[in-house]
């Protein structure tokens, strides 16, 4: 399973470290960061991990799953575009879903794209959420 994560903070790094190695069924295909952090991210990651700075770049890569682990602002920036393009999205910033209007927009985008919106149990799914995808 090819996965792209949004965010390279504490949770994102935990996922990067957790999927490293041959034993993992998950392949980290890329990481999305703010444009100002792109070069820094490229220097930190192994060369076969792409660095993205926009939803359009992720859509073009066609991963099997995108995992948002950068907070509500990132979810609002990426969520609807990814789902409406047919990409499954796991949301770690579940607090954003408390906004009923926004939640409805995400669900409509998922329906439009034939995608799934995954909301893992607990405040932070991290590696446990990815492990459930096996």
Segments (PLM) and residue ranges:
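Beta-loop-alpha module in the N-terminal Rossmann-like domain of NAD(P)-dependent dehydrogenases
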Residues: 53-84, 96-100
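Hydrophobic Val/Ile/Leu positions in short beta-strands of Rossmann-like dinucleotide-binding domains
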Residues: 3-5, 68
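Rossmann-fold NAD(P)-binding glycine/threonine-rich loop
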Residues: 77-80, 94-116
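NAD(P)-binding Rossmann-fold cofactor-contacting core
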Residues: 22-44
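N-terminal Rossmann-fold NAD(P) dinucleotide-binding loop
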Residues: 12-13
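General beta-strand structural signal in soluble alpha/beta enzymes
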Residues: 68, 91, 117-121
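Conserved anion/nucleotide-ligand pocket segment
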Residues: 115-134
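Glycine-rich Rossmann-fold phosphate-binding loop(s) that bind the pyrophosphate
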Residues: 8-9
């Amino acid at each position: 399973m090819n996965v792209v994560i949004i965010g390279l903070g504490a949770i994102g790094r935990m996922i990067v470290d957790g999927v490293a190695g041959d034993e993992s069924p998950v392949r980290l295909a890329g990481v999305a960061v703010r444009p100002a952090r792109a070069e820094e991210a490229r220097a930190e990651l192994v060369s076969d991990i792409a660095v993205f700075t926009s939803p359009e770049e992720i859509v073009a890569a066609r991963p099997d799953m995108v995992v948002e682990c950068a907070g509500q602002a990132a979810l609002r920036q990426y969520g609807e575009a990814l789902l409406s393009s047919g990409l499954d999205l796991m949301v770690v910033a579940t607090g954003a879903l408390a906004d009923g209007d926004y939640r409805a927009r995400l669900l409509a985008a998922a329906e439009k794209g034939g995608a799934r919106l995954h909301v893992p149990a607990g405040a932070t799914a991290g590696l446990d959420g990815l492990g459930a995808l096996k």
